[in-house]
Structure formats: C-alpha cells, structure tokens
C-alpha cells in the first residue's frame, strides 16, 4: 500500500464527509491483509433510526465488512449483525439500513476481516 496515496485518499474522503454531513456516525479504521481488523463503535446518547449507510475502502482489493447494532427496549437488548464482502475498487457501497433493524438503535459498530490487501475504510450513517 502506498502510504502517500492512502493519506490523500483519507484526506479526500474526510473532506467529502465534512461537506456532506451531518451524520449520526462516522467510523474509520485500517485493515491489514489476512488479519481481523479492529471493531469501531459509535454509541448514541438516545436511540436513533438509521437512514443512509455507506461504506468505502481504499484500493482495488476486497474486504469482509461486519456491521452490527444494538437496540434496547426496556431491559431487553437486541443485537443485529450483517456480513458483506465489499470490492473496494467499486467505490462507495450503499447498505440498506433495514439490515440494522427497523427500530431505533443505541449503537452501531463495524469491523473488517479477510482483507486481501492492506486498506483503510470509512463508514457513514445518516439519520432517517
């Protein structure tokens, strides 16, 4: 991975995110080929209903995205997890918010695994 190209890509994506907000959550991390990536989480002060969700990763490789959420009703916590293989070269990947459930959520988390080359990624979640 060319670090200069990666730094420019991250800077460009961050500028687009800053101009396109507001977002409920913006998650970002790097993934190393053949390793499980870190899980990144955004917790909300109050339950939120997600709208548009977009995932974008750097380069031409593929990565497996694990997207999860928790929703609390009274004392019951319901978790939802979705796994998708994403081709980074195809540009931003739109994710149907119904994959996180149809009720307001308390948090959203994302992790990547099975990257076939080193990459970095952004996930944005807009409100409904």
Segments and roles (model prediction):
Residues 35, 42, 54, 77-79, ...:
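Residue-level signal for the start and early helices of compact helical domains
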Residues 1-52, 58-62, 124-128:
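Extracytoplasmic low-complexity, Pro/Thr/Ser/Ala/Gly-rich segments
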Residues 61-78, 122-127:
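Short, surface-exposed beta-strand/strand-loop-strand elements in extracellular ectodomains
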Residues 24, 37, 62-64, 77, ...:
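Polar low-complexity intrinsically disordered regions enriched in Ser/Thr and small residues
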Residues 48-54, 96-121:
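Noncatalytic modules at the cell exterior or secretory-pathway interfaces
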Residues 69-100:
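An anionic, turn-rich surface loop/hairpin at beta-sheet edges
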Residues 36-38, 49, 59, 80, ...:
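Residues that act as N-cap/strand-start positions at coil-to-secondary-structure junctions
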């Amino acid at each position: 991975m060319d670090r200069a190209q990666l730094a420019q890509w991250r800077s460009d994506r961050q500028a687009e995110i800053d101009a396109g907000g507001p977002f409920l959550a913006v998650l970002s991390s790097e993934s190393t080929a053949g390793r499980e990536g870190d899980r990144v989480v955004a917790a909300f002060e109050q339950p939120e209903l997600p709208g548009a969700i977009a995932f974008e990763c750097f380069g031409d490789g593929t990565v497996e995205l694990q997207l999860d959420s928790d929703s609390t009703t009274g004392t019951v916590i319901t978790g939802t997890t979705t796994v998708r293989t994403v081709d980074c070269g195809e540009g931003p990947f739109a994710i149907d918010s119904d994959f996180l459930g149809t009720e307001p959520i308390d948090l959203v988390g994302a992790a990547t695994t099975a990257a076939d080359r080193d990459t970095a990624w952004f996930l944005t979640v807009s409100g409904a």
